[in-house]
C-alpha cells in the first residue's frame, strides 16, 4: 500500500512513490522449499492398515439409519475433491481408480453420499502445535458462489447480481498456519465474526493483529474478555480520538493514537509489530491460488465443511516445507 507513506500530500508524490523499487528477498533454503512444493502435487497414495480398518462406519447402537462409510472415508474423498478441483462424480471416479490400483477391497462412496454426508460431517478442529506465544492475525476476503465469469462481464456486462460469501480466518504469525476459519454472508461485518474465531482457539493469545475494519469496541471487548493481557494491534480509524479516560486510565487504543500522533503511522506499525499482518494476506492469497476463489458448496452447512477442510489441507501443505528468506535490497 504505497499511498499510506504520503497520505497528507499523495497527489504530489504519486509518481515518485509508484516508481520506488519493491523490497527484494533471497530464499535461503531453496532446494528444500522446491522439494516441498513438488510434494504438494505428488500423486503418491497409500492406505495404512488403520485407515483400511476405519473405512467402514462403526455400527450404531441407537435407533436410526446406519452409516455405511466412516467420517475418515468422507473426509478423504472431499479433501481430494478440493485439492484436485473435481466435481462429486469425478471425485467418486478418482477414489475408485486409486483403490483399484492399490488392489484394495473397499467400497467407494457415490456422489450422492458425498453430497449428503458433507452436510453433517464433523471436521476435526484446527490444532496448533505448541510452539510458543500465539500472535493471531485476522482478516477476511470474498469467495464467489456463482454468477457470470470475469470474461463474460468484461465482454458483455451482466444484469445478474453475483453471489458472494465472506471467508474469515485467523493465522498464527509464527507458523503461518490457519488456526481458525469461518464463513459468513457478504453483508456480515468483519468485527461480528471475531467471537466465532476466538472460540476455535484454545491457546493463550499474546497479540491480536487486524486492519482498521476491526477498530470497534466489541472487538477489543471480546479479546479482553478472553485475556486482558492480550496486545490489540489495530490501527485507529481516520478521525479517531482518545477516550474520555485517556488521562487517568488510558486504553491500548489511546496509547496507539498518541504514538501515531507523535511519531506517525509508519513508525507505529514498525514499533508495534503491526507489519506482521502481511502474513494473513499471504495466507488468503495462498487459499485462492491453491483452493480457488469460488465455493463449490451451496448450503451453509456444506460451506462450513468445505472451509474447514480447505484450512486443514493448506496447513498440511505448509507443513511440508516453508521458505526461509532474508532481505537483500
Name each model feature, range by range:
Residues 1-64, 76, 105-106, 116-132, ...:
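Charged, often Cys/His-bearing segments associated with DNA-binding zinc-finger transcription factors
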Residues 29, 109-110, 299:
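Helix N-terminus capping/helix-initiation residues
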Amino acid at each position: 500500500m504505497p499511498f499510506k507513506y504520503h497520505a497528507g500530500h499523495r497527489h504530489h508524490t504519486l509518481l515518485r512513490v509508484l516508481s520506488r523499487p519493491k523490497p527484494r528477498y533471497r530464499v535461503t533454503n531453496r532446494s528444500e522449499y522446491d522439494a516441498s512444493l513438488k510434494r504438494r502435487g505428488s500423486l503418491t497414495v497409500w492406505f495404512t492398515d488403520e485407515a483400511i480398518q476405519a473405512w467402514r462406519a462403526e455400527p450404531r447402537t441407537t435407533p436410526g439409519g446406519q452409516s455405511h462409510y466412516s467420517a475418515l472415508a468422507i473426509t478423504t474423498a472431499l479433501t481430494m475433491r478440493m485439492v484436485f478441483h473435481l466435481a462429486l462424480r469425478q471425485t467418486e471416479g478418482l477414489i475408485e481408480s486409486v483403490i483399484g490400483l492399490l488392489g484394495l477391497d473397499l467400497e467407494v462412496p457415490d456422489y450422492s453420499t458425498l453430497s449428503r454426508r458433507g452436510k453433517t460431517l464433523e471436521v476435526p478442529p484446527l490444532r496448533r502445535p505448541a510452539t510458543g506465544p500465539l500472535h493471531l492475525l485476522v482478516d477476511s476476503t470474498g469467495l464467489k458462489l456463482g454468477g457470470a465469469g470475469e470474461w463474460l462481464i468484461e465482454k458483455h456486462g451482466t444484469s445478474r447480481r453475483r453471489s458472494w460469501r465472506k471467508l474469515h480466518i485467523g493465522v498464527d504469525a509464527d507458523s503461518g498456519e490457519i488456526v481458525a476459519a469461518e464463513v459468513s454472508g457478504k453483508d456480515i461485518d468483519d468485527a461480528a465474526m471475531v467471537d466465532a474465531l476466538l472460540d476455535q482457539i484454545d491457546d493463550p493469545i499474546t497479540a491480536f493483529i487486524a486492519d482498521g475494519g476491526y477498530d470497534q469496541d466489541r472487538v477489543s471487548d471480546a479479546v479482553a474478555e478472553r485475556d486482558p493481557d492480550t496486545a490489540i494491534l489495530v490501527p485507529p480509524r481516520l478521525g479517531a480520538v482518545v477516550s474520555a479516560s485517556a488521562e487517568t486510565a488510558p486504553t491500548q487504543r489511546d496509547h496507539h493514537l498518541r504514538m501515531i500522533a507523535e511519531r506517525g503511522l509508519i513508525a507505529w506499525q514498525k514499533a508495534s509489530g503491526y507489519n506482521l499482518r502481511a502474513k494473513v494476506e499471504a495466507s488468503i492469497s495462498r487459499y485462492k491460488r491453491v483452493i480457488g476463489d469460488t465455493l463449490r458448496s451451496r448450503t451453509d452447512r456444506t460451506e462450513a465443511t468445505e472451509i474447514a477442510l480447505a484450512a486443514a489441507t493448506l496447513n498440511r501443505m505448509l507443513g511440508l516445507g516453508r521458505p526461509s528468506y532474508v532481505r537483500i535490497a
